[in-house]
């Protein structure tokens, strides 16, 4: 099975590639439109700012390709945030608008920001993304921005506020 990890130049590619490899797949790291469209599954990791990642996607001519893919697509960290419609980061900017949600700054007077640590994740809706994973399992978080719980939320957690840990719309997951 063909698995592609989109390379925006703003991602933790080696850790994602290693994790996918441990599941028995040989992922390809690529910016090729052809490889992306021919793949069976797509991973879209990201680290850094929404502005730099959106700039990279535009420069690589991948904005419309990502919006048009039909195969399963998993956004990880910044990759998830870019699937939304708007980010408060960098004085606010429009993102890919694949799933209608804003990405908001995590604000807390009680806890340090960025949020850095392990949280229990509560599955809110039955979804293939969590097959074989026990409800309230721990996941690692390192972020300063959140997606509030919304109609696309399939799992949530809390750090000062409750927020989406995973969302799903059609073939797009985060």
From Swiss-Prot:
Pathway: Amino-acid biosynthesis; L-histidine biosynthesis; L-histidine from 5-phospho-alpha-D-ribose 1-diphosphate: step 5/9. Keywords: Amino-acid biosynthesis, Cytoplasm, Glutamine amidotransferase, Histidine biosynthesis, Hydrolase, Lyase. One of its GO terms (cellular component) is cytoplasm. Residues 2-174 form the Glutamine amidotransferase type-1 domain. GO terms for molecular function: glutaminase activity; imidazoleglycerol-phosphate synthase activity; lyase activity. InterPro entries: Class_I_gatase-like (IPR029062), GATASE (IPR017926), Imidazole-glycPsynth_HisH (IPR010139). PANTHER family: IMIDAZOLE GLYCEROL PHOSPHATE SYNTHASE SUBUNIT HISH. NCBIfam families: IMP_synth_hisH. This is Imidazole glycerol phosphate synthase subunit HisH. It comes from Buchnera aphidicola subsp. Schlechtendalia chinensis. The lineage of its organism: Bacteria, Pseudomonadati, Pseudomonadota, Gammaproteobacteria, Enterobacterales.
